């Protein structure tokens, strides 16, 4: 159990530092879109997809490596990667309606909660 905790901890730290570095370098390119954030979200989605596809074929590997990459690194880099893989699994299972619903709920739910936070902070 301690090796899994350490794996997630190390992966999360590395992902978080990489997210900070990429955002620092790229977010000032445009005042309209956070290019760094978009970049880490896309990179995280690619990495988690590649990682899970690899780990599904390589069952001999210690589960700590999978958790270091997915929960740790991609979780630290971005939570969008987890969201993406969940939607892809729904699509692969032929659950188009659920996939679309998941996309819409995550997108609009996140936007609404962020808006709520801004409204609440403005009121304080």
Swiss-Prot record:
Disulfide bonds: none annotated. GO terms for molecular function: fluoride channel activity; metal ion binding. Its main location: membrane. Na(+) is not transported, but it plays an essential structural role and its presence is essential for fluoride channel function. It catalyses: fluoride(in) = fluoride(out). Na(+) binds at residues 75, 78. Fluoride-specific ion channel. Important for reducing fluoride concentration in the cell, thus reducing its toxicity. This is Fluoride-specific ion channel FluC. It comes from Photorhabdus laumondii subsp. laumondii (strain DSM 15139 / CIP 105565 / TT01). The gene is fluC.
